[in-house]
Amino acid sequence: MAHAVSRAQNVTVTIRDVRGADELRACQDLQRRAWGITEDGYVLPVATMAGAQKVGGLILGAFDAQNHLVGFAFAFLGRLKGRLILYSQLTGVHPAHQSTGIGRLLKFEQRRRARDMALDAVVWAFDPLQASNAAFNLGVLGATCRIYEVDMYGARTDALNAGLATDRLLAEWPTAAEPIAGRTEPYPDGVDLIHTTVVPGLGFRKVEHISPIPPAAAHLHIKIPGRISELKAYSSSSAAREWQNALRETFQAAFAAGFVAVGFSRAEPDQPCYLLERTA
């Protein structure tokens, strides 16, 4: 088990396996709270979680000193490009405990368990438009991305996904070596693929045009909005869809050309960017 102290409320947190139906139901409640889910169809069934646990799935919980669930992570065995992996479907933290390091503890325990099972990597999907997730996954954990999935889950109506396709990047976190934090500073020779302009009077940026990848480029920058939720609120998702289409085009082109996303920079808060390097 792993232990840590939540900086926000000075709560001692224990990371351990979730046990029994009551704790699995607590995982359901936490899903609703963490992501604002109101439709039961988007919540993992207790039977699914219990069944996965019996055949190699992993459900980790973060419990406070009163044994209340404040975070959890659900993962199962999978195969990606011929490699056995631990696929992390969900990692969520109660809103009162977010940004306190609990998510990091859960991910590192997942990685330790995957290594003990002789699995090559922990893999999970995330929305490339969400800057905080990108900064955590690539910058803090040191995961990399080389696969872009178009509309991975189909249309959804929950608050986080409504109005957009569910495009996702796959984060890959190898278990063979000790993890190293990803790059967080732009490359001096990085080529910007997405060019933006500020919308007068609103303060957010929209896509102006996309540049092709120069044949000799070694490093790329792919920009995203600083605050996608605010942009969606101002534009009823139309500007967000333009951004999503731009990311889809540039990531697919970059990955096809042999680039890998290895970091994320917030040097410019209103237009953070993914950092990619050529590997082939």
Residue ranges and their predicted role:
Residues 114-127:
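Conserved GNAT acetyl-CoA-binding A-motif
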Residues 1-7, 20, 117, 130, ...:
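Intrinsically disordered, low-complexity, positively biased terminal segments
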Residues 94-96, 127, 225:
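Residue-level recognition of the GNAT/N-acetyltransferase active site
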Residues 38, 100, 117-118:
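Short coil/turn segments at alpha/beta junctions that flank glycine-rich nucleotide-binding fingerprints
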Residues 93, 99-114, 133, 243-246:
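Conserved acetyl-CoA-binding loop-helix of GNAT-fold acetyltransferases
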Residues 89, 125, 172:
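A cross-family glycoside hydrolase active-site/sugar-binding cleft signature
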Residues 15-95, 265-267:
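A conserved beta-strand-loop-helix scaffold within acyl/acetyltransferase catalytic domains
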